[in-house]
Amino acid sequence: MIRKIIFLEMLLLGIATFLYSQDEISKITITHGPYLQNVGSNEATIVWITDKPSIGWVELASDGNGSFYAKEHPRYFDTSNGIKNTSTIHAVKVKGLTPGKQYRYRVFAQEVLKHTGYKIIYGSYASTDVYYRKPLTFHTCNPQAPATSFVMVNDIHGDNKLLEDLMSRCNLTQTDFVLFNGDMLSFINSEDQLFKGFMDTAVRLFASEIPMYYARGNHETRGVFATEIQRYFSPCQEHLYYAFRQGPVYCIVLDTGEDKPDSDIEYAGITQYDLYRTEQSEWLASILESTEYKEAPFKIIVAHIPPAVTEAGPDEDWHGNVEVEQKFMPLLRQAYPDLMLCGHLHRFVRHDATDKTSFPVVVNSNTSLLRIYATTTQMKIEVMDRDGKMPVSYTHLRAHETCADL
């Protein structure tokens, strides 16, 4: 009898241990992120990824540096048309924020084990840590700030070491935002490739707390996963092209699409970028007429593919360059921006203002970090390579004035 009791006790203990271990194994985790997208003066989007289907939400605190556990915080859920999304990709757009203010935040996910009819069975939670670490923070944009500082990286094609080297050349504590100007990968075939290719590194270095604005390059249009890109970048925006203002700088971020004709055999009949750029030009025309654009001391155009120019090199007059020249540049020449920032060419090029085009076009190389510090009267532009050398540095004055090399 005693043996039977001992056997039953051991059996029950074994079952309990097994169930506990299975529960531990099956706990949901946040696999990537969180990171910031489309931060504006009164809104911000936060994105994170989980390993299991779940609902997700953000808790936001604007009450200084006290404990995050001091009081309950409002929850902002990942929803679509009034329904909480069950997904492994979560994106929450928080509105009604105050310009130039710091916010602390925490992201959550709760696994959805089963959903049938009116019955939903939930599983365990996952969240960012606010017990052993300080909560993540971000600042909303402040259009009234007297100055701003930002950096741009492009064309790293999945080279994480290069990205880390370049980002080490800037003081992130004095950087308001980061521009990724396209071709951060050579193609996109999976979510795993996107994060291992550069985004996990970006999150580790800065992207959870410093806004990152993304301009799609022609290589992000390639691969079976290319159609999914807006689930990760600008996920709560209507388009992949958009505009924002930080301090004296108003940025218009364009999506220049592919670099060859839609009919090229390389695209296998899957692209329609000529029409896409035409539709985008209509949006651009309206933005250039906006009060926000006209009132900004400095206007910067961000576009991966540079326009075709008269003195173009052998790789500056492809179809994509011509499309940018024909569909975007006529509008820009009438609106007098101060600067156009591009990538794509894998080398540094600077086309100064001419009688035809009143603003310079600066093409950053694939192995350099471009850094800009702007006040209401001038912009200082520096280009640094991964070794910290600064081959280019000059000051750019307001539109219609000249650039002075330093």
State the predicted function of each range:
Residues 152-154, 178-183, 212-218, 301-303, ...:
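Active-site neighborhood of phospho(di)ester-bond hydrolases with catalytic His/Asp-centered motifs
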Residues 40-43, 54-57, 67-77, 82-83, ...:
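N-terminal active-site segment of His-dependent metallophosphoesterases
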Residues 395-402:
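Conserved small/polar residues in nucleotide/adenosyl-binding loops
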Residues 158-162, 186-189, 216-225, 259-262, ...:
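Active-site environment of divalent metal-dependent phosphoester hydrolases
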Residues 48, 100-109:
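Short beta-strand segments enriched for Tyr within beta-sheet-rich domains
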Residues 267, 273, 292-339:
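Active-site-proximal segments of metal-dependent phosphoesterases and phosphodiesterases across multiple
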Residues 22-55:
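Non-catalytic, glycine-rich low-complexity segments
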Residues 108-137, 193-293, 327-331, 350-375, ...:
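Extended active-site neighborhood of metal-dependent phosphoesterases/phosphodiesterases
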